[in-house]
Amino acid sequence: MIQYVVKRDGRRVEFNNQKIVAAILKAMAVTEKGEDIVLAAKIADKISHLNKSEMSVEEIQDCVENELMNGPRQEVAKKYIAYRNKRSLARKAKSTEIFQTIIEAQANDVTRENANMNADTPAGMMMKFASESTKPFVDECLLADDVRAAVEKNYIHIHDKDYYPTKSLTCIQHPLDIILEHGLKAGHGESRPAKRIETASVLACISMETVQNEMHGGQAIPAFDFYLAPYVRKTFEEEVDKISDITGEDYSALKDVKLDDYIRRDLAGLRGSERALQHAVNQTVSRTHQAMEAFVHNMNTIHSRGGNQVVFSSINYGTDTSAEGRCIIREILNTTYLGVGNGSTAIFPIQIWKKKRGVSYLPEDPNYDLYKFACKVSARRFFPNFLNLDATYNQDDAWKADDPKRYEHEVATMGCRTRVYGNKFGPKTSIGRGNLSFTTINLVKLGIEAMQASEDRDERLRIFFEKLDWALDMAARQLNDRFEFQKTALKKQFPLLMAGLWLGSGKLDDNDTIESVINQGTLSIGFIGLAECLIALIGKHHGESDEAQELGLRIVEHMAGKINGFAETYQHNFTCLATPAEGLSGKFTKRDKKTFGIIPGITDKDYYTNSSHIPVYYHCTPEHKAKIEGPYHKYENAGHIFYVEVDGDATHNPEAIMRIVDLMDKYDIGYGSVNHNRTRCLDCGYETAEPNLDECPHCHGHHLDTLQRITGYLVGTTNRWNSGKLAELRDRVVHK
């Protein structure tokens, strides 16, 4: 008697003869004689009593065909065979169609899912082949049936599902001091500890490049200035030794001089030790600048993940007030301002200025001059973004101004917005930690279903919150299932990540599982489309209605509360994410359109609004936007971002950037950035803020590249954006 069925993907499931009955009745229903439930049950019963303990799906279907062909209803056999062949062709056709678009390098939402990936190259094509092949395996083999149904019905989205079988984690804030002080082993080579700024810069690149191959998300350095500062000093001391060697004079005492700053100055009129000191400073600044140039250049040219994607890198800086730390900050800003190559804007690393009162924000602060410079650089090059360490939820009582390692108590962020700080299972820090995986809830679908279920507003909201709780429970259970799968990975699967970079991993042996250390990371539940959800529930979004704002905050606060509860239930660091939604914004919308049709203000565009943002098409002032979006950030502890679109050439108006940072300070906003248009001629390098240009005003060439921020990061060309994000870009309005 059959007990188990072997599915096409290799899974063994319990045999259920009612599935045979249902399949036969479906074939009978399209014949003249119609259904015969007695015959269908008789055939199913005969097959189920075959002298086999298990059979494959194909074997069972062969048996059904034989029984039908040898029975009184041969016309049913023909319908059954035709349907079986049709389903087989459909399965093959779907994969074939997707693969064909990759082969032909077609620009569509499959090949443009990730704007940082070039899917047209051979390596990029291989990545997409693997990605599209893996997702069905995950659906069939790794997801619970109800989770798979929730994904198929567009309620939730599992991010980086193609990496699910690899057991990889999402991202990490690199404790770079470990690499710099102890060296590293990568591939067939190994590096000694850094002794100068150039080596430190290269090791920073190698660390992020190597670990990106072991993870499916981004790489970040939480305290770029603090980590590299000691190597500025080592470089200075090396320059002093060079001077002694060249001149034959003993200038070793200069190595003990405490410098107030590293500023390049003319040597004219200087003599003896004073001249030697300034020359050493000048050389150190020059070498530091070149090291920062090399770092930025490498981050934009060294490919990772099979050779088709540059490292999705971020660096945090701004709070090191030492002379050496300030030198690092100044030269990374100088490098960014000047651009790379022919003066183009560097796409990576995403740079993040740590804004903190008493350190790097107010006129009397020691790094205020560098803060002003950072705003000038951001006005021209989009970066740095701004991280508000003064936000109430970003402050840490352990932070002390005289602590040389105070950066350990400073929140760091990465990429579009990812934030990891609170910790139930270890130190409260960003360093050596990251996200494990995240899943997003489609708030819009829940809102539409509640809208259609009742005309009474109170009843509608009751239904919505009931559905929201169901979706939250589903997402939490799915993330816990993925965690249970991830924790079985062995340390040796992540040779550099788990060699001491991930918090606590240094104690693991190669064949140990990572179970004991990955709980230092976070599991995040995100959301998309709050604005459209509010329109469905009460007819207006939160940017245009106080009532909608009140409800929006109630929804997100409710989500955050439930997610905090999951942390206790599952004993993991669960957090609430304002999902960045690059490819997802269009995917959810496209499917909901098929289900609900075009609903004005809700499904009438090709995208849903990002997380808790005001819709991009809504005209308002920067302050209104800050006032509305700011209160959500305290609930979105897995990450959030505030952005403002500015008009004209921001290059000549860095004060506008400073005013926006002031709004962040005023409205308790955690992380923000400024968007503006930048069009560059690829022939002559001319740059302008003029949008929609067809011809370069300088050389009259037509090879123009438009640079814009897609979610929280830049893309070298909008040609790589998917259709949903391109539609959103067209709808963006200036906030003024």
Describe each region flagged by the PLM.
Residues 89-90, 95-519, 540-541, 545-705:
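Conserved catalytic cores of very large enzyme subunits
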Residues 26, 523-536, 557, 709:
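Contiguous, well-ordered alpha-helical segments that form the cores/surfaces of helical PPI scaffolds
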Residues 286-290, 296-297, 535-536, 722-729:
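Metallocofactor- and cofactor-centric catalytic cores in central/energy metabolism, strongly enriched
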Residues 1-105, 109, 727-733:
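Charged, amphipathic alpha-helical regulatory modules used
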